[in-house]
Amino acid sequence: MASNTVSAQGGSNRPVRDFSNIQDVAQFLLFDPIWNEQPGSIVPWKMNREQALAERYPELQTSEPSEDYSGPVESLELLPLEIKLDIMQYLSWEQISWCKHPWLWTRWYKDNVVRVSAITFEDFQREYAFPEKIQEIHFTDTRAEEIKAILETTPNVTRLVIRRIDDMNYNTHGDLGLDDLEFLTHLMVEDACGFTDFWAPSLTHLTIKNLDMHPRWFGPVMDGIKSMQSTLKYLYIFETYGVNKPFVQWCTDNIETFYCTNSYRYENVPRPIYVWVLFQEDEWHGYRVEDNKFHRRYMYSTILHKRDTDWVENNPLKTPAQVEMYKFLLRISQLNRDGTGYESDSDPENEHFDDESFSSGEEDSSDEDDPTWAPDSDDSDWETETEEEPSVAARILEKGKLTITNLMKSLGFKPKPKKIQSIDRYFCSLDSNYNSEDEDFEYDSDSEDDDSDSEDDC
C-alpha cells in the first residue's frame, strides 16, 4: 500500500493503494472500507480511485477515444471491457454474486457470449459498447419489451436463451422480434408461459421447457413450428402442458430429431419410457433418470450442474441390454452434487429410488418376470454381456471416460450410426463436442440377420 494520501470528498485524507498488482484492484473494489461511509450506503466513485487505477493502466489518462473505449474515464464503472475482465479473473463467482457494483455482476461477456439478468435496454447500452459483436445471449428475469429492444441492436446473434420472462402473458404472445434475427440458429425458451413467437428464418434447434400453455394457446406455437419445417432439424419439448397427439405425430413425421416428454395434461397421451443422461465435456454431472417402472419421481428437483442445461438424446428401453444400461445409470447417478465422487448408500438422496435393490446395490432380477420388459421379436440384433464378463460398471469406470460411445461399447451392443448423436452444449447439436473417434466406429450388429431398417433399434 502506498504511503501518500489524497484529499477525497469531505476533505478527509485517505490512503491510496498501489495498484501495480491487478489483484489489489479486485480486493480493493470488494473489501476496502472507504466504500461505505454509512452501513448499506455505496460511496460514489471518487477521483482518487481513478488515479490509483491509472497507475496500472496509464493509457486511461488519454482523452482521445480508443478503438475499444468511447471516451475518457469518468468512473470505474466505465472501464473498458478488457480491464473489467482483467480484474474479474481474481474474483470468485461467490464474490461477484453478492458484490453491489453492477458491472461486477454477471453483466460481462467473453468470447462474444453475454449473460444478463433483469437488465434494461439502457443498462445494456451502457454495458456493451459493441453489441454487433455479440453472438450468444442468455436472458434471465428480463421483461419482454427490454429483450425485444436489445435484440434490435444485436443482429448477429446466433444462439439465444430466454428464461423467466417477467411480463409475458397470453395476450402478448411473446413477440420479441425474432423474425429479424437472420443468423439465429439455436433458441431455448424456459419458464415463459404464453410465449408463442418461435419463428426465426434460420432456426435449426428449438428447445421449449415449462411453458404450461392452455391448448387454445398452443395453436400459434404449432403454426410457427410447422412454418419452420424446411429449416428446423431439432425440436425438444419438456414439461410444456398442452401438447396434443396430432402435433406430436406431425413432429415425429416431419422433424429430423424430435423429443417430447412430461408435456401431456389435457389428453391421455401415453408416456414412453426414457432414460435421461447429462454429459458435459465427457464428464458425468448427473441430471435425472425417469421411468414409469423403477421410480416415478425426479432424482433431483433442479439441474445439479450450475451451468446451462445440456440435453442428451433419449433411448427407449426395449431390449435387455438397454434395461441393463438403465440399471447402471441409476447406480452411477448417485454421484454427489458436484460430480466428483460417489455418495454412500445411506445418503438421503437414495430415498428417491422406489426399488430398494438399486439403493442397496443388489442386482434386481424382477425384470425377467415382468412382461413390460419382455424383449422385442428382433432382439437377435443385440449383443448382451454374459455372466462371466466383468460388470458393466467395472468396464465403464475402467475406461476412465464416461462417454456415450464407451457406454454403448461396454454394454455390449452397437446401435446404428444414424441413431448416435454427439452433444452440443445447451441444444444437442451435432456441430460441437463431437468425438472424432466415433466416426470410425462401426455401429452395427454382428448378427447376420440384422435388419438395418428396424425402427426398434436404439
From Swiss-Prot:
Positions of region (Disordered): 339-397, 434-458
Protein name in the entry: Uncharacterized protein 002R
The organism's place on the tree of life at top rank: Viruses
Positions with biased composition (Acidic residues): 344-390, 436-458
